[in-house]
Structure formats: structure tokens, C-alpha cells
Regions:
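Aromatic-lined, polymer-binding surfaces characteristic
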Residues: 1-169
Length: 169
């Protein structure tokens, strides 16, 4: 999450060096850290491709969607570093992130009973709101709202606590 820190440093100082480095590294990450296939060799969705420790674990995809990338966009979108070329690259990656969260996450957490699923749907919701021009944005937003409701039902106790008992949840 150091890219978030770089964006925040730019936001606090106005020093374009931080903005440039954040954009440069995010662009490089998009170019070189490729997502696994959503499908297995038989053409079926492959949720296990997104369940191991990797930058493309569904949880990481969701966290980028609600915690990291929206802040980077908010703080850096008006800088000269946020070029049209970078915007297009980011937009394509956001579409892939949304597709993973929409298609894969429900297969990983069919009962909506895990905090990972909550964060994955927060990511889908945030990205669909941030990019309403995406062709499937309305579908993603509706799905994330429905699934967050399911998360509340499955993960909250009658008194409002989270079932894992963690105050941060």
C-alpha cells in the first residue's frame, strides 16, 4: 500500500515527485503483474486462481478497489502525471478488477459469511461508483449492494457486532 502513501505525500506537500512515482509504479504494476485466467482449462470459472497468496487474491483485488486506488485517483487525477494513456490503462485494469470481484468472489464465499467477501464487495461498489461509465457499472453496483446486505445478515450478531469479534470489522 505504499502507493497510497506516495499519493498522500503528494496531497500533503504538493511535491510532484511523489505523484510521478506513484503513477509510474502503478503503471508498471499494471503492465507486469498479470491476473490469472478467470477460467480453467475446461472453460469454467476458476475461483481457486484467486484464493492463494498472490497480488490477485480476491481480497487484494477488493482492497485495491475501495482502499487504495480510489484515493490515488482522488489525489492524483488533476496532476500532469495522470495522463490520458495512464487513465486508459487504469480503466482497463479497473474493468478487470470488477469482473473478478463480480464473477469470482461469490464462488469463493457463497454464504457471504467472511470478512474477505465484505471487503471484496466494498471494492466492487467503490469502483462501480468511481467509474459509472463502465458498461457493467450499474450491474456491479446493484450486485455489490445485494451482497453487502447478505454480508450484514451473515456476519453481524443480533446486537450489531461482527461475528469474528474484531473491533475493526
Amino acid at each position: 500500500h505504499h502507493l497510497k502513501t506516495l499519493a498522500e505525500a503528494y496531497g500533503l506537500t504538493g511535491n510532484l515527485t511523489y505523484a510521478q512515482k506513484a503513477i509510474e509504479e502503478l503503471s508498471d504494476w499494471i503492465d507486469h503483474v498479470h491476473a490469472p485466467s478467470l477460467y480453467d482449462e475446461q472453460g469454467n470459472l476458476a475461483p481457486l486462481h484467486f484464493d492463494g497468496l498472490s497480488p490477485w487474491r480476491a481480497l487484494e483485488v477488493g482492497i485495491r478497489g475501495y482502499r487504495t486506488w480510489p484515493l490515488i485517483i482522488e489525489l492524483l487525477a488533476d496532476t500532469p502525471c495522470f495522463t490520458e494513456e495512464f487513465q486508459q490503462k487504469l480503466y482497463q485494469s479497473v474493468q478487470l478488477h470488477c469482473k473478478i470481484l463480480y464473477e469470482i468472489s461469490p464462488l469463493l464465499w457463497p454464504k457471504a459469511d467472511h470478512n474477505h467477501y465484505l471487503m471484496e464487495n466494498l471494492g466492487l461498489m467503490a469502483l462501480s461508483c468511481l467509474f459509472p461509465e463502465m458498461p457493467d457499472s450499474a450491474k456491479y453496483l446493484s450486485h455489490s449492494q445485494q451482497e453487502l446486505d447478505r454480508c450484514m445478515e451473515a456476519q453481524c450478531t443480533p446486537c450489531g457486532g461482527q461475528i469474528e469479534g474484531s473491533p475493526s470489522y
